[in-house]
């Protein structure tokens, strides 16, 4: 749970609606949980980037399966994900995407 704590601190209230650290942990680890993780309005692209970064930390054996299940949990279409997940680090990111990418870089380095 320790490695998810900075993500929870940074993203809950910004990219995700309010949720406890325990429920956040359960959702991210695909455990059954009555409180579903919900993306805030206009944050789906940044969540796609976060999913990408998190999936890169997983072994190849689990990466695709976890990504597919978390996309389904968050109601993100795979084609949308594939077209948007790199936007925060594209050649011309928006200011908010650029800020988010820098915050995530400090967490994931």
Locations of regions flagged by a protein language model:
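Flexible coil/loop and intrinsically disordered linker positions at secondary-structure junctions
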Residues: 1-109
């Amino acid at each position: 749970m320790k490695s998810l704590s900075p993500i929870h601190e940074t993203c809950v209230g910004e990219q995700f609606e309010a949720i406890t650290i325990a429920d956040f942990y359960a959702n991210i680890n695909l455990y059954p949980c009555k409180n579903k993780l919900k993306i805030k309005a206009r944050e789906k692209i940044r969540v796609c980037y976060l999913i990408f970064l998190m999936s890169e930390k997983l072994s190849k054996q689990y990466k695709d399966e976890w990504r597919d299940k978390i996309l389904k949990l968050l109601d993100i279409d795979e084609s949308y994900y594939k077209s948007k997940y790199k936007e925060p680090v594209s050649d011309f990111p928006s200011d908010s995407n650029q800020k988010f990418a820098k915050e995530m870089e400090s967490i994931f380095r």
